[in-house]
Regions:
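A transmembrane-helix-recognition feature enriched in membrane-embedded lipid enzymes
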Residues: 1-48
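Walker A (P-loop) phosphate-binding motif
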Residues: 37-100
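Redox- and metal-dependent alpha/beta enzyme cores, enriched for Fe-S-associated oxidoreductases
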Residues: 222, 226-270, 324
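Short, flexible loop segments at boundaries between secondary-structure elements
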Residues: 263-264, 304-327
Length: 327
């Protein structure tokens, strides 16, 4: 239901009339979510489980965090494998993602990206996914977007927060972007990873909620620069927090002549990409997007779009040290 939701403006405005109207619905959403979570008894997996999650609907940076954690765990484990629900895809039963066989329509865009990092399992039933992964040699599991899923017992829970987005207007869905209250998410977290610029107010707030939680910082960096004439680009993406991609382009020195945002997990049409391509050509700019968006572009137009590859880079070695010590 939430797969193709575009973040409304009032999600950043706590005083909006719309927020006040939707607050009763938010309370109902919270009640139903809590009942669902508390009605499940977590199952202990046969290998350690690292859970990556957030308290907002998209945009915090879970997918690049999954890649980072997976790569760091390889220093201690032979076969880290990833569990994801496959949001945006129609396959519901457990399946190992094959990038040569599956499309984003089947397994979702994020699962296709994860499958390039490590064996990735899609399935609504995370317990069955975990069993399948272990049967195929997994010695540690990374559970993507697992904070609101109690089906598996977690050995380490990492809360991901974007330093600009933070918690939006601080209201629960649908009045705001929160899936659960920040206090709840922080209370059950073992580590907090803040992505973006330093935000001392946010760090102080986290410590006030849970004084013992270690806080780490990381930044998004472009790994492969796109050959761009005169540094002129037109960017587009369908992310939970699209402004993050635009800001990354600006910070890396590109002149962003135009930027178009779509709903998270948006499936692109030929008409949309043709319009974007024509717009970029009209201003003598290169059309750029993220890898997550590129996998959903109709094949006939992929030569017209350049991919800006981005990875998450920790501020220092402390995050890796804490990660490996806790498992």
């Amino acid at each position: 239901m939430l797969g193709f939701l575009r973040s409304p403006k009032f999600w950043n405005d706590g005083n909006s009339v719309v927020v006040k109207v939707l607050d009763p619905v938010s309370r109902l959403y919270s009640f139903v979510s809590n009942v669902r979570l508390n009605s499940v008894t977590p199952v202990k997996a046969d290998v350690p489980v690292v859970c990556i999650g957030n308290v907002v609907l998209g945009g915090a940076g879970k997918t690049p965090t999954v890649e980072l954690v997976c790569n760091l765990l390889r220093e201690k484990y032979k076969s880290p494998q990833i569990l994801t629900a496959g949001y945006g895809g129609y396959l519901k039963n457990v399946v190992r993602v094959d990038t040569n066989l599956h499309s984003y329509l089947q397994v979702g865009d994020e699962a296709l990206l994860s499958a390039n990092v490590a064996p990735t399992w899609v399935g609504r039933n995370r317990v069955n996914s975990a069993k399948a992964a272990v049967a195929c040699g997994a010695d540690v599991l990374i559970m993507d977007d697992g904070f609101q899923n109690n089906s598996i017992e977690k050995d380490l829970k990492i809360l991901v927060i974007d330093s600009r987005q933070v918690f939006g207007n601080e209201h629960l869905f649908p009045a705001g972007p929160l899936r659960e209250l920040p206090e709840s998410g922080i209370a059950k977290s073992d580590l907090a990873l803040i992505i973006g610029e330093k935000n001392e107010a946010l760090e102080s707030r986290i410590k006030a909620m849970k004084s013992t939680i270690p806080i780490f910082r990381a930044k998004m960096e472009i790994t492969d620069s796109v050959p761009v004439e005169n540094n002129r680009v037109v960017g587009f993406c369908g992310l939970g927090y699209p402004l993050k991609f635009k800001q990354t382009l600006v910070e890396c020195g590109y002149e962003v002549l135009d930027f178009v945002s779509f709903a998270d997990h948006h499936p692109y049409t030929i008409t949309e990409i043709q319009k974007l391509s024509n717009g970029a050509k009209s201003v003598n700019a290169t059309l750029v997007t993220t890898m997550k968006d590129f996998v959903k572009i109709p094949a006939v137009f992929r030569n017209d779009v350049s991919v800006v590859k981005i990875k998450l880079v920790p501020e220092n070695e402390d995050f890796k040290k804490a990660l490996l010590e806790k498992l």
